A protein has these predicted regions:
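Left-handed beta-helix
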Residues: 1-152
Length: 152
């Protein structure tokens, strides 16, 4: 803090959840922490007095079809789930095909996962298509990343 004396700083006390994110791996780990750490989730999103302002999209609610299963996941509206989702974050408009398993993954908006796929520790950017019978696997310390608008 060699320039601390030259500036004017404002601070405030924060007693809630905090995560230092300085890398892609940190982002992945701390984001998924919201699916398993109830204290972190409620500290950030569970306080009624702390409103979250966002754009309204008037999207359909999530559709859970026969054979679907969801555990410890955050799922945005307009998603269609036919497979199994565990400890994952699905953004708006994600589609999970029949028989597919998505674990410990973050799928950004518009991602489509085909039938009988297996995804573990995967991060997809927007509008990614994952073909039927595809297996993608990363690790907690090095998640598998699929860039925007790619087809795998």
């Amino acid at each position: 803090m060699k320039n601390a004396s030259k500036g004017c700083y404002r601070t405030f006390k924060h007693n809630g959840y905090f995560a230092h994110i300085s890398s892609f791996t940190d982002y992945f780990r701390h984001s998924l922490d919201l699916t398993t750490n109830r204290g972190a989730f409620y500290s950030l999103l569970g306080i009624p007095e702390r409103r979250i302002f966002t754009r309204v999209h008037n999207s359909a609610p999530v559709v859970y079809l026969n054979g679907s299963s969801v555990d410890n996941s955050l799922i945005a509206d307009d998603c269609v789930i036919e497979g199994k989702v565990e400890n994952s974050i699905l953004f708006r408009g994600v589609k999970i095909g029949r028989g597919s398993v998505v674990k410990n993954s973050i799928l950004f908006g518009g991602t489509t996962v085909g039938r009988d796929c297996d995804l573990n520790c995967v991060v997809t950017d927007k509008s990614v298509t994952i073909s039927d019978f595809c297996r993608l696997s990363g690790h907690e310390s090095l998640p598998f990343y699929v860039s925007k608008m790619r087809r795998v």
